[in-house]
Regions:
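Extended beta-strand/beta-hairpin segments
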Residues: 1-71, 82-183
């Protein structure tokens, strides 16, 4: 939940508390001797349990920061896109995104995401403007707070279909769009 930032009309603060639950008795005395489990807490919301990716000795049954990163880009795009469609009188009746990100590791163990690709599959009600629905994906990227805050390319491969009897497949976008994050 955001709170208005004091003295700044259009600024909002977001807070999270992270608690590490991985001390197995000896802290971090060895790399293999501690757990990677943690909880993220937000006022008034359920805790989120997380861990490292299994390649970093994490629990594969828990979400990791990389999962959250890809999901935050995907969900921010979704919410921006739905708002734009509603304002443009485009009736979205279903939306799914098979988003993915590529993390490249350095020899020293660090690294960074190389890119994230969003693959939204959108179903529109009959009578909706399919061409405009395609175009709004780029506008949604420009409006997405998370995408505007990252320094990697966020690619878009939308598929859109009009809900009609017998037409069960989403059509691929006329082109794949690449939206670079702003400096």
């Amino acid at each position: 939940m955001s709170t208005p930032t004091a003295g700044r009309k259009n600024a909002h603060d977001y807070k999270a508390r992270l608690v590490w639950d991985g001390n197995l008795g000896d802290g971090t005395t060895t790399y293999t001797g501690y757990g990677r489990k943690y909880r993220v807490q937000f006022d008034g919301k359920p805790d989120l349990s997380g861990s490292a990716d299994p390649i970093f000795r994490g629990d594969p049954s828990l979400y990791n920061p990389e999962d959250y990163f890809v999901a935050s880009l995907s969900s921010c795009h979704l919410l921006s896109y739905l708002a734009l469609c509603a304002r443009s009188k485009i009736n979205v009746i279903a939306y799914e995104d098979d988003a993915s990100g590529t993390l490249v590791l350095r020899p020293d163990g660090g690294g960074k995401f190389e890119s994230v690709t969003l693959r939204p599959s959108v179903t529109l009600a009959p009578g909706s403007d399919e061409k405009k629905a395609f175009e709004l994906h780029e506008t949604a990227h420009d409006m997405c707070f998370i995408a505007a805050s990252v320094s990697i390319p966020v690619l878009h491969e939308p598929r859109i279909r009009i809900d009609q009897a017998g037409d069960q497949t989403a059509k691929p976008a006329q082109k794949s769009t690449e939206s670079e994050a702003r400096p």
